[in-house]
């Protein structure tokens, strides 16, 4: 849900339409993500998130985001148990991953999908660089972090070959294919501004990474 929300809040939801048209990519979302992004915001008194929820619902109605209701409960239980018993602080396990991320990972594993779209830092680092996450947690919590090597190894086995794509990377791919070409001579400036907007919308990306992105594009 994090990447969908980032792109929607940054008024960049048409990245999904563009990439689907240009590449034939499929964007599959599990039911828990629909619940978090659409159903919950539409059925609470606070209407602050209603506009974003309706835009996401429109993408589902248009077939751009395709909902998947597969029985991945067994895989979810295993991923949640393993993922939340890797790191310990003061002798207690740190609960790091939740229903949305767990279901998405389980669905990707079940359907043999190589990439997941995710802006949330903790789960991404848990997949890509768990020891970097350990250092981050130690600095954030100001305590020593212990590692359950058995759970860590199991998580690496469960997510082997799984790639994580952030909303910023989806934007850069779309940019390289002409998504922003209608801006003519300010196209690159718009791309950079959009990356900063995605960062402020919730994508876990550093200023250094944005600079590196912009150096790598024409």
Predicted segments, located by residue:
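Active-site-proximal, substrate-binding regions of enzyme catalytic domains
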Residues: 2-114, 121-218
């Amino acid at each position: 849900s994090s990447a969908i929300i980032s792109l929607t809040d940054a008024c960049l939801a048409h990245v999904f339409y563009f990439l689907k048209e240009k590449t034939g990519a499929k964007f599959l979302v599990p039911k828990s993500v629909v619940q978090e992004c659409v159903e919950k915001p539409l059925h609470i008194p606070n209407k602050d998130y209603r506009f974003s929820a309706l835009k996401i619902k429109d993408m589902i109605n248009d077939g751009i985001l395709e909902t998947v209701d597969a029985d991945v409960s067994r895989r979810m239980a295993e991923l949640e148990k393993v993922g939340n018993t890797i790191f310990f602080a003061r002798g207690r396990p740190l609960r790091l991953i939740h229903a949305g991320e767990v279901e998405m990972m389980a669905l990707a594993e079940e359907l043999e999908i190589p990439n997941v779209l995710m802006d949330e830092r903790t789960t991404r680092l848990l997949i890509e660089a768990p020891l970097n996450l350990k250092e981050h947690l130690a600095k954030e919590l100001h305590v020593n972090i212990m590692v359950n090597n058995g759970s860590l190894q199991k998580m690496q086995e469960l997510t082997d070959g799984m790639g994580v794509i952030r909303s910023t990377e989806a934007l850069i791919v779309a940019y390289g294919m002409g998504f922003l070409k209608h801006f003519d001579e300010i196209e690159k400036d718009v791309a950079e501004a959009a990356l900063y907007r995605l960062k402020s919308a919730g994508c876990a990306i550093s200023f250094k990474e944005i600079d590196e992105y912009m150096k790598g594009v024409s």
